[in-house]
């Protein structure tokens, strides 16, 4: 059976943490920020951990 190829979109969007969890950025913080409140943009600033169910699929995409 041939090797699985890494999903290009997934490798750009997800990073593996030291403990083995997957990290992702939050949506809605790229552009059109002028009409969004400062409170909202601050809340969207940090990275989040991917949920277990989603992580299983993403791991396959990344070949982990």
From Swiss-Prot:
Signal sequence annotation: none
Region Disordered, annotated ranges: 1-29
Keywords assigned by UniProt, alphabetized: Ribonucleoprotein, Ribosomal protein
GO molecular function: structural constituent of ribosome
Ribonucleoprotein is among the record's keywords: yes
GO CC term, one of those recorded: cytosolic large ribosomal subunit
Domain of life of the organism encoding this protein: Bacteria
InterPro entries, sorted: Ribosomal_bL35 (IPR001706), Ribosomal_bL35-like (IPR021137), Ribosomal_bL35_CS (IPR018265), Ribosomal_bL35_sf (IPR037229)
An annotated GO BP: translation
Keyword presence, NAD: no
Family: Belongs to the bacterial ribosomal protein bL35 family.
Record-linked HAMAP family: Ribosomal_bL35
Name of the featured protein: Large ribosomal subunit protein bL35
